[in-house]
Amino acid sequence: MNAEHSERLTAPLPWWLIAVGTGAFTGWLVRVATTFEIGLVAAVAAAAIALAVVAAYGAVRVQATPEGLRAGRAWLDRAHVGTIEPLDAEGWARALGREGDVRAFTLTRPYIRTGVRVAVEDPADPTPFWLVSTRFPASVARALGDGS
């Protein structure tokens, strides 16, 4: 029996703190040249924009079910799933580096150091495999099955 896997690739806490810091710094810069009130408005606006960017970047979902794999907006039907390889940090670095292929579909996040490589078994698709960031590569592989 295959389990299902669903995760949101949320940005880590330091990214959120940097977004807030961006707002504070922007407010200070504006305050130096104008008034406190205008600086405060600039700080709130800049922080809101930076936080929205971090939230949007981390809103991408990875879902693996017996029916297939969804990575962001992309979908790979189970009928086209080949070999599924969970990758630890070292394997992930190799897959994104010297073992990479420019034709591969990638959904990666720099703050997630593990992922899965899923071979694409569709003769009409030029994509050889998908590389998808996930904090739980074994869970994604388990949800998809063994690929045979």
Locations of regions flagged by a protein language model:
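N-terminal membrane-targeting/pre-transmembrane regions
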Residues: 1-33
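Single-pass alpha-helical transmembrane signal-anchor segments
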Residues: 20-27, 40-55
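A short linear-motif detector with a strong N-terminal bias
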Residues: 40-43, 48-49, 61-64, 94-99, ...
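Conserved beta-hairpin
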Residues: 46-85
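Non-transmembrane, membrane-adjacent beta-strand/coil modules in membrane-associated proteins
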Residues: 72-131
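C-terminal/domain-terminus segments
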Residues: 127-148
